[in-house]
Amino acid sequence: RNLFFIVLMFFAVFQVMGSEKQVDTTELKKGDKCPEFVFKDARGKEHTLSELKGKYVFIDVWASWCYPCRKEYPYLQELEKKMEGKNIVFIGISCDHIEWRWTGALKMGKMGGVQWWIAGNESFLKAFRADRIPRFILLDPKGRVLELNMTRPSDSETEKYLLKLKKI
């Protein structure tokens, strides 16, 4: 009985020590270059944000279960249409923990545009301090953080801000 308890404690300590090594606590600040996080699209193909270099990148961090996220989506689509032809790309990044919830939300919500899934990559959420969603982030054409907490698409200031960007 004591041996079982010792073995159990050994595994518990090993798990805690092992998980600490995997946690990336780096938090990004304005002006920081965005790391190479890997995301998946609905077909399973891997992508990184560096693929979008040369354009401003407006990131919408959302989840299928998030009502405020879904409420912003029509405004995001409208903003994307207004900015068509400009030097900006809009991308949705789902932080759903389960892939089928994300893909189901894509189908049910008839969500268009570029949609990626974090695929369990919690370091993305930690780096951007995205502990609450929806979260909107803006990267500059060089892949640097311009805004960590961008205003929502439903806020009229968002469009005004974007139109004032250099070489938009």
Where are these regions (language model features)?
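Bacterial Sec-dependent N-terminal signal peptides
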Residues: 1-22
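N-terminal "domain-start" segment that seeds a small globular fold
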Residues: 19-49, 158-160, 164-167
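Short, internal strand/loop/helix patches
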Residues: 40, 103-142
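Active-site acidic short loop of glycosyltransferases
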Residues: 53-55, 85, 111, 130
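Alpha/beta-hydrolase fold active-site loops
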Residues: 56-57, 134
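Short beta-strand segments
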Residues: 60, 91-94
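Conserved redox-active cysteine motifs that mediate thiol-disulfide chemistry
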Residues: 61-78
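Thiol-/selenol-based redox modules, centered on thioredoxin-like
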Residues: 138-168
